[in-house]
Amino acid sequence: MNKKTRKIVFVGLYIALAVVLQYVSGLIPFLQMPNGGNIDLGVIPVLMASYQFGYKTGIFTGLLCWLINLVLGISGSWFVSIPQYLFDYILPVSLLGLASAFPKIGKINNIYTGVTGAMILKYLSHVLSGVYYWFPETTY
């Protein structure tokens, strides 16, 4: 099999796996938080794609996962404003693809630093989304 064909097939498999895991994690009650949010299993295939093919393909895989979840209605998106939607839904999934871009620190393998760094970036993106949603009310 050609390298490009192999890459396309694997990215398709990672996207399909991410969509299925996102759907399944929405069905499992103990993964749902009482005040909103959940533990998302769909991030695992995006991280795997990033480490197998590099951060550019990881970002692309994350964006396609978001798009397919949006089309299928799995993600349960909540639109308030464009910056809020960008920072809460599009950017976090894309930032997961950056996991392979984090370097090795000392004796710590770059998988640990990459996954931790990508999850911190994802968290910061959600925090910025909250700022865009809650901050305008307190400015008056």
List each model region and its residues.
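Loop-helix junctions at membrane interfaces
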Residues: 1-140
